[in-house]
Amino acid sequence: MCLLKLPVVLIVLLVALHHLKATPIESNQVEKRKCNTATCATQRLANFLIRSSNNLGAILSPTNVGSNTYGKRSTVDILNREPLNYLPF
């Protein structure tokens, strides 16, 4: 009896698989969300200023934010410095 059920199950699975391949899958396009956070507003303002700088001239001077900027602490100075004792023991 079990041997007779196996071909029937295989045929049902084959028909189901064929049906799944034949039906097109609807693709939902992802809508761009509007963001109301301060970070997003800042990024949008920065993008606007960058795009409009070609027409209006340089609005913002470039800032030096690289790894070798003035005022950056070197790790050698930090390691050689004495620890601060805020709490007396």
UniProtKB/Swiss-Prot annotation:
Functional description taken from the UniProt entry: Amylin/IAPP is a glucoregulatory peptide hormone that plays an important role in the regulation of energy homeostasis. Selectively inhibits insulin-stimulated glucose utilization and glycogen deposition in muscle, while not affecting adipocyte glucose metabolism. IAPP function is mediated by the CALCR-RAMPs (AMYRs) receptor complexes. Amylin can also bind CALCR receptor in the absence of RAMPs, although it is more selective for AMYRs.
This protein is called what?
A: Islet amyloid polypeptide
Give one GO molecular function term.
Answer: receptor ligand activity
Q: Which residues form the signal peptide?
A: 1-22
Q: Per its UniProt record, what InterPro entries does this chain match?
A: Calcitonin-like, Calcitonin/adrenomedullin, Calcitonin_CS, Calcitonin_peptide-like, IAPP
* Subunit description: Can form homodimers. Interacts with IDE and INS. Interaction with INS inhibits homodimerization and fibril formation.
- Which organism's genome codes for this protein? Felis catus (Cat)
Q: Which Gene3D superfamilies match?
A: 6.10.250.2190
Q: Which gene encodes it?
A: IAPP
One Gene Ontology cellular component annotation? extracellular space
User: Disulfide bond: present as a keyword of the record?
Assistant: yes
Domain of life from the UniProt record: Eukaryota
Q: What is known of its domains?
A: The mature protein is largely unstructured in the absence of a cognate ligand, and has a strong tendency to form fibrillar aggregates.
Give the record's GO biological process terms.
amylin receptor signaling pathway
Location in the cell reads: Secreted
Entry keyword set? Amidation, Amyloid, Cleavage on pair of basic residues, Disulfide bond, Hormone, Secreted, Signal
